Amino acid sequence: MSHSVKIYDTCIGCTQCVRACPTDVLEMVPWGGCKAAQIASAPRTEDCVGCKRCESACPTDFLSVRVYLGAETTRSMGLAY
């Protein structure tokens, strides 16, 4: 089953999510929006097993990385904050 991995611009570039991912779905890419000058990216979402370890590892108050599982993807993405 395919999962959707969304990286938000609240990412602080700490690499915690990248290190927590057991299937190497995430990687860091250059980005000028934070002091670390990098942001998480999810180029291999087809390898995501939906364990959400990346979410658990994220130290930001608003989770900067979110994994949406199957049917949850379309339902959750439509919510307004």
Curated annotation (Swiss-Prot):
One of its GO terms (biological process) is photosynthetic electron transport in photosystem I. The keyword Aminoacyl-tRNA synthetase does not apply. It is a peripheral membrane protein. InterPro entries: 4Fe4S_Fe-S-bd, 4Fe4S_Fe_S_CS, PSI_iron-sulfur_center, PSI_PsaC. It is an enzyme of class 1 (oxidoreductase). The keyword Transport applies. PANTHER family: PHOTOSYSTEM I IRON-SULFUR CENTER, PHOTOSYSTEM I IRON-SULFUR CENTER-RELATED. This is Photosystem I iron-sulfur center. It comes from Nephroselmis olivacea (Green alga).
